């Protein structure tokens, strides 16, 4: 598995490459209470505005996935673990039609749990995520106007 220090290293490494102009990329390291899923979270904001998120969660053990989008109360993610049968949880779906974007569709409700159940982010104090943005396509809150009725 990947060490926790590696998450911060990944974020710093991506930012260095972006600052040097090697890649058009930036990142942000999140931990603890900043790592959760809902409409107002920084993770969801990144996913809704062209970013992605590497998060540590649980799938039989600590595990890392790449979140790539949000759709209808679900997180679209790429899970590198090969899984060839349906999950016991019928609302967690495998998707083989988007191999360059995601291969799992997981409802929000699984992530914010503080236990070590499937796709849980686990105890708040142990949570980590790295938000990743393509600087050419990234939008910032000031550039996005949202209307609430």
Regions from the PLM with identified roles:
Residues 1-119, 123:
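Conserved active-site-adjacent core of cysteine acyl-enzyme catalytic domains
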Residues 60, 74, 120-149:
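Mixed-charge, low-complexity intrinsically disordered regions
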């Amino acid at each position: 598995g990947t060490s926790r220090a590696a998450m911060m290293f990944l974020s710093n490494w991506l930012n260095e490459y972006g600052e040097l102009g090697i890649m058009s990329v930036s990142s942000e390291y999140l931990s603890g209470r900043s790592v959760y899923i809902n409409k107002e979270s920084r993770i969801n904001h990144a996913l809704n505005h062209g970013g992605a998120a590497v998060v540590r969660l649980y799938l039989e053990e600590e595990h890392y996935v790449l979140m790539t989008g949000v759709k209808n109360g679900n997180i679209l993610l790429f899970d590198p673990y090969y899984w060839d049968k349906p999950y016991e949880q019928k609302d967690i779906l495998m998707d083989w039609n988007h191999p360059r974007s995601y291969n799992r569709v997981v409802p929000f409700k699984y992530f914010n749990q503080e236990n070590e159940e499937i796709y849980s982010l686990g105890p708040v104090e142990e949570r980590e995520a790295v938000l990743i943005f393509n600087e050419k396509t990234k939008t910032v809150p000031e550039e996005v106007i949202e209307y609430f009725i």
